[in-house]
A protein has these predicted regions:
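Short, extreme N-terminal segment that most often corresponds to the first beta-strand
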Residues: 1-24, 150-152
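Low-complexity intrinsically disordered segments
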Residues: 26-152
Length: 152
């Protein structure tokens, strides 16, 4: 389980300028056009979703700084930039190497055992499944991991 994060706006012009065709209409936390931007999951580095105007964390900040957008999670909790920084950008260190890695104890008899997991956490999306999905991800200039595809 993890938590999904969104950026949303009620401004149609901002939607058209920054979201292109990739948005959803939602009523949580209020009526907004939203775009999925990130997910945090236990043991993993945060994962960000790339889009038309978002290719880096700096791009998310740029949208937020226009004051036409809000950031919130799937439960409707709104975040200012400092709260988003604490909750998402620093989650499990945020980028590979920011915190010491710890060995994952693997029990082949456990119902939760996953042969594709790397040996250490926090887990990078580049390492999962022995790198089979690495081409679906890229790092922004700050080292945050972005997916080229939609996910939730």
């Amino acid at each position: 389980m993890g938590t999904n994060f969104y950026i949303g706006t009620a401004d149609k012009d901002a939607r058209d300028t920054y979201f292109g065709w990739k948005y959803k209409l939602t009523d949580t936390p209020t009526w907004l056009y939203e775009q999925h931007i990130a997910k945090t999951s236990m043991g993993w580095l945060p994962s960000f979703e790339a889009s038309y105007s978002i290719q880096s964390v700096a791009d998310i900040k740029k949208l937020y700084d226009t004051r036409k957008f809000i950031i919130y999670d799937e439960y409707g909790t709104e975040y200012n930039w400092e709260e988003f920084d604490e909750r998402v950008l620093k989650f499990n260190g945020g980028v590979l190497g920011a915190i010491p890695r710890e060995k994952i104890e693997k029990d082949i008899n456990s119902p939760y055992w996953d042969r594709d997991l790397p040996d250490y956490r926090p887990i990078s999306h580049f390492e999962y499944a022995r790198g089979r999905y690495a081409s679906e991800h890229f790092r922004d200039p700050e080292g945050y991991e972005f997916s080229r595809y939609e996910f939730s």
